[in-house]
C-alpha cells in the first residue's frame, strides 16, 4: 500500500509552485529593452529663467530637473525653446547644462500634518521641524468647482471685528478683498479674522508673498500668541526667495485649503498680497518675452487671478458641504482704486473692505471707509439677530459723517442735528476696536441694541472703550445669574426678549463705568484705566510709547514738586539778570560798531576806564550794577554818551541810535 503524503506538506508544495509560477509570469512581462529618455540643453539662463531646447513634448507647469539637482517648471512653451522658471537658486545652471523631464506637474503636500507648520510653497519646512510626509499631494493648479457643485453662501464667517460683522458680513465660501494704501492695517485686519477662528472649526492658511521676513515673523508670533496655531498653516515665500516660488505661493495655499474643504470642513485663505503677486507675474512675463499690455502687465493677468480666486466656494451638500473662504489683500497707490490691478480684483471678488489712510492717521482702527466698502453677500450670510440690530447703523453713520463735514463751518442750532452728531460720535467710538480684542456675536448684538435704544447717548465717547472691554464678562455674569441650575444650554441669540433684557442691563454697566471714571478723575488717574489694561490692546509698540510718555510726564511732575517756589523765583531773577546783562553788552557792542563806522571817529582807549562826570570809573559802575538784583542801564553806554567827542553832533546821533536800540 502506497503511503499518502502528509496534507500540510502538500499545501506547502502547492503554494511554492504557485509562487514560482507567478514570478515567472512577472519576469516574462518585463521589457528588457533599453528605455529612451529625452534630454534637453540649457541655451541661456538669467534672472531665474532658463531657456531650454530639445524637450518638445513638455507639458505646461511640468517639473524639470537640471543637472546638479536644481528644479524648475515650464512656464511658456514655444516651438524651439521652453521658458523654465527656476524654483531654486540658479547656482550651477549654465549654458549646455542637461535638463530632464519628470512627467509630473507641480504638487504640494496636503493633509493634517501641515497644521501648525511653516512651509514654503513646495511643502519644505521653514520652521526647523521634521520633514513632512508626502503621502498625499495635490497639484497646485486645480480646476474651480463647477456651478452644479456649488451651494449658496449662507453661513457667516465671524471675524470678531464689529464694523465688519455688522456692516460688511463675510460668509463662508465668499471672496472679500481687503484693499488700501500701504500701512493702513490691511494685514492686521486679516490676522484679526484668523485669530478669531480659535473658537470655531475653520482651518486657516496664511500665504505671504514677497513680504519681509521680519513682518512674516510678527504675523506668526501674533497667531501663536492670540490665536490657535494648531489649526493654521503658514505658506511663506519671502522677498528674498526665487520669483518662481513667489508666483506659485497662492496656488499652493489654495491647494492646501482645498484638501480640508473637500472633506466637508471649512477653510480660510489669506493671501498677502496679490499686488506683489501681480508684480512677480509681470516680472516673469517680461523675462520670458511675453508681449506687455496695460502698465506692462501681460494680457493674462486677469485670468491668472480669476482662476485662482474662483477656487473659493461653498460646496453642495452632496459633496460634503465644505467651504473655502478667501481674504485676498491688495495695495493701492495714493488711494487710487481705479488702477489696473485693484479694478481687476474688485471685479473678481464678492466685495471689498477699503481702508483709508486719513482715517488711520486719525487713530480710527480699523480704518474702514464705510462709503466705499461693500459685501455682495451681506445679509444673506448674517446672523438674523445681528442683521436686525445693525439695520440702521450704516445709514446713521453715513449721515453723521455728512453732518460732521458741514458743521465744521459753523455751529449747530437744531436739537435734532445735535442728537445725530452725538449718536454718530458714539458709533465712531464703538467701531474703533483695538487689535486682538475680538467680540462675540452676542457681544456685538447687545452693543448695537443698546446703541439703538439710546443707552450710549448720555455717556462720554471716552467711556465707550471701557464699555466694550468689560461687556463680555458682564454678559457672562448676567447669563449665569439668569440660567437655572442644571438647565440645558440656551441659544440667547434666538431669543429676542432675552436679548432686549441683556441690552437694558447694559445701562447699569454704563453707570458703573461712569462712576469709576469720576472717582479716578477725582484721584487724578486717567479715565481709561477703568477698563483695565486698555493701552496694551493697541499693540506692544504703542503701549511702550505710551509708557515712555507717561514716564516723562511723571518725571516732569516730580521735578516740579521738588523745586520750591522761593527757589523758582530766585532762578527766575538770576536768569532775567543774565538775559538783561547780555542784552546790555550786545547794545554797547552795536553802539561801538556804529561809532567806529562814523567818519573821523577815533578808536576809544580800552586800556584805562574813562571817568564819568559825577561818579566812579566805568569798571566800578559796571561792578556795582552787576551786583544789583534787577537789570539797569549799562554804565558803558552812559560813559560813552558823556565822554567828550571830536565829532560833536555825529556822536550825539550815534548815541541816540544806540540808546533807542538799547531801550528796544
From Swiss-Prot:
| Entry membrane topology | Peripheral membrane protein
Biased-composition ranges for Basic and acidic residues? 543-588, 621-639
- What EC numbers are recorded for this enzyme? 7.1.2.2
The keyword ATP-binding appears for this protein: yes
What is its EC class?
A: translocase
Catalytic reactions on record? ATP + H2O + 4 H(+)(in) = ADP + phosphate + 5 H(+)(out)
Chief location: membrane
- Record-marked site positions (Required for activity): 373
Where does the record place Low complexity bias? 589-599
* InterPro entries reported in the protein's UniProt record: ATP_synth_asu-like_sf, ATP_synth_asu_C, ATP_synth_asu_C_sf, ATP_synth_F1_a_nt-bd_dom, ATP_synth_F1_asu, ATPase_a/bsu_AS, ATPase_F1/V1/A1_a/bsu_N, ATPase_F1/V1/A1_a/bsu_N_sf
Fetch the PANTHER family from UniProt: ATP SYNTHASE SUBUNIT ALPHA, MITOCHONDRIAL
| GO molecular function terms attached to this record | ADP binding; ATP binding; proton-transporting ATP synthase activity, rotational mechanism
Tell me the compartments it is located in. Answer: Cell inner membrane
**Described function:** Produces ATP from ADP in the presence of a proton gradient across the membrane. The alpha chain is a regulatory subunit.
Q: Which family does it belong to?
A: Belongs to the ATPase alpha/beta chains family.
Q: What protein am I looking at? A: ATP synthase subunit alpha 2
According to the record's subunit comment, the protein's assembly and interactions are: F-type ATPases have 2 components, CF(1) - the catalytic core - and CF(0) - the membrane proton channel. CF(1) has five subunits: alpha(3), beta(3), gamma(1), delta(1), epsilon(1). CF(0) has three main subunits: a(1), b(2) and c(9-12). The alpha and beta chains form an alternating ring which encloses part of the gamma chain. CF(1) is attached to CF(0) by a central stalk formed by the gamma and epsilon chains, while a peripheral stalk is formed by the delta and b chains.
Q: Which residues make up the binding site for ATP?
A: 180-187
Q: Where is this region: Disordered?
A: 525-664
